[in-house]
Amino acid sequence: MKTVMATGTFDIIHPGHGFFLEEARKLGGEDARLVVVLARDSTVRARKRTPIVGEKQRLEVVRMLKPVDEAYLGSETDMFEIVHRIKPDIIAIGPDQKFDVDELRDELRRRGLGCEVRRIEKYRDAELDSTCKIIKRIRSMEFDEDSLKNC
């Protein structure tokens, strides 16, 4: 059985996340084990923006998703720490993640981690296929008190 590790923020779950996780799992074959590592809130703030959903809730939601066998929060100091613990055969990188696959592969080798690194293509079958698009849509909408009374 091959272990595939997928990483990401997973803030405001959308179809792109589901596609990424399904495709990541497929990389390991029929009996693959998919382990998801979520970026910590502090990491997201440093690299992107303040997450809408906190790390504990994001972790809880990801653990509920069908393709996922296990999910953990990543390290706040060394992103390779959890890779040593999980020992994946394959690391799946999302289309919007800012990693250079070759550089990541080289760093993994330097650290004695000989796993394969693969980038998953972008999901394009939904209008709202990214958290940023969802945030922009919400910000562009006008809400009155009546429409928010049941929130």
Curated annotation (Swiss-Prot):
Its cofactor is a divalent metal cation. It comes from the Archaea. Transmembrane segments: none annotated. It is an enzyme of class 2 (transferase). It catalyses: FMN + ATP + H(+) = FAD + diphosphate. It holds the Pfam family CTP_transf_like. Pathway: Cofactor biosynthesis; FAD biosynthesis; FAD from FMN: step 1/1. InterPro entries: Archaeal_FAD_synthase (IPR050385), Cyt_trans-like (IPR004821), FAD_synth_RibL (IPR024902), Rossmann-like_a/b/a_fold (IPR014729). SUPFAM superfamilies: Nucleotidylyl transferase. Homodimer. HAMAP family: FAD_synth_arch (MF_02115). PANTHER family: FAD SYNTHASE (PTHR43793:SF1). NCBIfam families: cyt_tran_rel. Belongs to the archaeal FAD synthase family. This is FAD synthase. It comes from Methanothermobacter thermautotrophicus (strain ATCC 29096 / DSM 1053 / JCM 10044 / NBRC 100330 / Delta H) (Methanobacterium thermoautotrophicum). The lineage of its organism: Archaea, Methanobacteriati, Methanobacteriota, Methanomada group, Methanobacteria. The gene is ribL.
